């Protein structure tokens, strides 16, 4: 969505809508792929009304809303123990804040998230700590810091987890 389908104001233009519908009318299946969670892309999916699959969380969740029986549906989650260990380890890193997301819930080490179009506006995060009982399997973890601190953070995380994770 971002940087392609949506304009600089995070809106769909009529030209984009018409183009995607023209492609569908030629017999092609149109899929939406985004790094956003579904809750932050649902409005665009509904507005486009194409009926095809949507992949969220950079491909960790793929589904067709309203079709739970779709054979192509999948959801790759993270191990809860790993996530809670990373939450505890995060306290030793030069990170401004951390977010853990599931399909429905948002956890953070902050009570209030900064203003951002990618965060739910109508949902406060659940404050997370080492002993938090996660109410759903997490799909994504994001650590936020100044760009100059990111190489150090990445190195320390990869050292701790034996390069078993991918950092983007």
Residue ranges and their predicted role:
Residues 7, 31, 73, 140-143:
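Short, flexible active-site loop motifs that bind/organize anionic cofactors or intermediates
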């Amino acid at each position: 969505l971002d940087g392609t389908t949506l304009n600089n104001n995070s809106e769909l233009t009529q030209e984009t809508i018409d183009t995607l519908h023209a492609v569908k009318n030629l017999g092609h299946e149109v899929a939406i792929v985004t790094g956003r969670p579904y809750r932050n892309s649902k409005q665009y999916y509904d507005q486009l009304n194409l009926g095809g699959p949507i992949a969220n969380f950079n491909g960790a969740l793929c589904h067709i809303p309203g079709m739970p029986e779709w054979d192509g549906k999948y959801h790759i989650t993270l191990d809860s123990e790993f996530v809670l260990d990373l939450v505890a380890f995060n306290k030793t890193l030069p990170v401004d804040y951390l977010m853990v997301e599931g399909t429905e819930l948002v956890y953070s080490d902050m009570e209030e998230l900064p203003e951002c179009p990618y965060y739910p506006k109508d949902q406060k995060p659940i404050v997370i700590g080492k002993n938090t009982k996660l109410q759903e399997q997490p799909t994504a973890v994001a650590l936020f810091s100044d760009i100059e601190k990111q190489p150090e953070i990445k190195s320390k995380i990869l050292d701790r987890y034996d390069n078993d994770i991918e950092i983007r």
